[in-house]
């Protein structure tokens, strides 16, 4: 029998008591949901929020639902009216996803929600549940989709400290979440402002003298070389860019120079425009631009192509695996300004992109820090 104490690796000063092992049934009432009959109009479009699993887990708190039911629908179904601060826990398909309800609500039958008792901090349990998602999945069953029963959830064992320590932990993690949310907002605001600037510049709301050129008059359009999955590495020096928005793998060889514009040739993301700041391997479903004309700045051209990206994506043909023909790419029309204006625009948009990327890196670092805390502050 182990003498190891039930304590976390990392905890606040002043707390030294051992944590207690309990079942979820000891700290919360588990409540299922239901769906009123959809063919009865009087059951729907009322004032009572009614959540489905697809709406849960994206954010810590959830306020409103996509659909609403009436009191008559509530009374004539197995849906239950849940109080504010209920932990909405998905028990079907996306098992273990969780959000906190900011107001009274109901759910469909894809939930086993937790109404916590007086001896626990609601937000602490929210964070704790996020650390044991694998336990929910392990206890789930089903052939069409996974599902975990109320009985199985009740039996899950968790470790909790005193209420005061629970609150200290949840306060810290909440502060970190607030910082992430603030960075999310800043990231979105900068992106929206950049889009606004691009509309003003490229939609000619700001007046410039310009000439129209076909893309093939400004650069050579090349198609990359296919690299088989067996030839890719998990941690190679150079990324492999194919038809998607993200690298499809890595390799220790490169075939395309840094500061190169690419356009996805095939797949669901065909038409996606990217600016590659380092050497990479251009794959078989990737167009890359080379031999740019002296009349165009590379980042200006990228920014203009990014602005018209929705139009480029509409050039796709084929239904199974859509693609964009090279001839259609070559004939894309580009608005070219005098070089001094191009450089001003490039510098402005590049500074915006650097700010957006800096915020994204900050956010990712905080998420990594939070993940480390979750691993060390819970038992």
Regions found by a protein language model. Give the residues of each.
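Proline-centric
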Residues: 13-18, 112-121, 134, 138, ...
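Non-catalytic DNA-recognition/assembly elements of restriction-modification systems
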Residues: 9-34, 50, 155, 207-226, ...
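Amphipathic alpha-helical coiled-coil/heptad-repeat segments
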Residues: 1-23, 155, 159-214, 331-379
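Short coil/turn segments at secondary-structure boundaries
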Residues: 37-45, 228-234, 317
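A short beta-sheet element
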Residues: 34, 46-47, 52-54, 61-130, ...
């Amino acid at each position: 029998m182990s003498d190891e104490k039930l304590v976390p690796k990392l905890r606040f000063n002043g707390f030294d008591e051992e944590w207690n092992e309990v079942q979820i049934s000891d700290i919360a009432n588990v409540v299922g949901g239901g769906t009123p009959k959809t063919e009865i109009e009087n059951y729907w479009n009322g004032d009572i929020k009614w959540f489905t699993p697809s709406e849960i887990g994206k954010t810590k708190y959830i306020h409103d639902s996509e659909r609403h039911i009436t009191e008559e629908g509530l009374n004539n179904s197995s849906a239950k009216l849940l109080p504010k601060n209920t932990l909405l826990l998905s028990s079907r398909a996306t098992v273990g996803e969780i959000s906190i309800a900011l107001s009274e609500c109901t759910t469909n039958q894809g939930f086993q929600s937790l109404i916590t008792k007086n001896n626990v901090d609601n937000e602490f349990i929210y964070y704790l549940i996020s650390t044991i998602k694998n336990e929910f999945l392990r206890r789930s069953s089903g052939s069409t989709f996974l599902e975990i029963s109320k009985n199985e959830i009740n039996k899950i064992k968790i470790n909790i400290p005193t209420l005061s320590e629970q609150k200290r932990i949840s306060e810290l993690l909440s502060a970190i979440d607030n910082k992430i949310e603030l960075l999310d907002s800043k990231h979105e605001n900068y992106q929206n402002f950049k889009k606004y600037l691009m509309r003003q510049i490229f939609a000619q709301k700001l007046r410039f003298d310009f000439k129209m050129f076909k893309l093939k008059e400004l650069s050579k359009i090349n198609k990359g070389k296919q690299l088989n999955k067996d030839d890719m590495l998990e941690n190679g020096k150079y990324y492999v860019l194919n038809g998607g928005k993200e690298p499809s793998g890595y390799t220790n060889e490169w075939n395309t120079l840094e500061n190169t514009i690419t356009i996805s040739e095939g797949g669901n993301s065909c038409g996606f425009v990217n600016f590659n700041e380092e050497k990479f391997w251009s794959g078989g479903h990737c167009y890359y631009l080379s031999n740019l004309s002296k009349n165009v700045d590379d980042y200006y051209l990228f920014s203009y192509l990014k602005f018209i990206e929705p139009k480029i994506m509409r050039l796709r043909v084929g239904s199974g695996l859509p693609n964009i023909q090279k001839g259609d790419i070559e004939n894309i029309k580009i608005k070219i300004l005098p070089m001094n204006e191009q450089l001003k625009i490039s510098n402005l948009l590049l500074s915006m992109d650097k700010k957006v990327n800096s915020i994204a890196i900050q956010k990712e670092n905080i998420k990594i820090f939070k993940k480390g805390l979750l691993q060390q502050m819970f038992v």
